[in-house]
Amino acid sequence: MKFVLLFGVFLVTLFSYSSAEMLDDFDQADEDELLSLIEKEEARAKECTPRFYDCSHDRHSCCRSELFKDVCTCFYPEGGDNEVCTCQQPKHLKYMEKAADKAKKFGGKIKRWFG
C-alpha cells in the first residue's frame, strides 16, 4: 500500500513539473507572437494615408482620428471621367467625436465642481 501511495505521489509530481514546463513554453511563445504582432502594427501604422490624400492605391490605409478610422471615399469630380478616392471622415462620425469631446470637457467641469 505504501508503495502505491509513493508511486502515486511520484507520478503527480512528475506530471505537475512537466505541465509547468509546457505552460512556460506556451507563455514564451505567446509573448513572442505578441511582440511580433506589435512590431507589425507599428510598421503598418507608419504607412497610413492622411485625411484628404489619395487612397486609391490602398483603400484600407486611411489613418485613424481620435476615436474612429477615416474611410476611403471615392467619387467622380464634376465633368471628369476619372474616379478620385480620398480619405475622409463621415459626417456622423465627425459629430460623434465632437459630442464625445464636449462630454469629456463637461465631465472635467463636474469633477472640479464636486471633486
From Swiss-Prot:
Top-level division of the source organism's lineage: Eukaryota
GO CC aspect terms: extracellular region
Major localisation: secreted
Propeptide positions: 21-44
Pfam annotation, one family: Toxin_35
Coiled coil: none
InterPro entries from the UniProt entry: Spider_toxin_CSTX_knottin (IPR019553), Spider_toxin_CSTX_Knottin_CS (IPR011142)
Leader peptide range in chain numbering: 1-20
Subcellular location: Secreted
Domain notes: The presence of a 'disulfide through disulfide knot' structurally defines this protein as a knottin.
The family this protein is said to belong to: Belongs to the neurotoxin 19 (CSTX) family. 01 subfamily.
Protein name: U3-lycotoxin-Ls1h
